[in-house]
């Protein structure tokens, strides 16, 4: 299943494109907190999916960040991109592009674009 299909599948299953509602249905943990030098990040810890979002962002930006981090949750669960970004010279651009595509596909359907 490609990235767009995965996002569309989630939207159909949960009958919404609201990432906060989908995340709740997935029993993932969502944490709003003041973050420094980052807008949001995903963590897989002790078999829990946790998404942290900067509480100071406007709600529409929080929604995009939530969808973006969900992309990491579904596409890159085993990749420790925070570690790769801060402790190695590995390029994580591909992961970020894929998470952006997932977020855009989740938030905006083909029908919405056609209108």
Name these PLM-found stretches.
Residues 1-115:
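Active-site hotspot residues in diverse enzymes, especially metal/ion-binding acidic/histidine motifs
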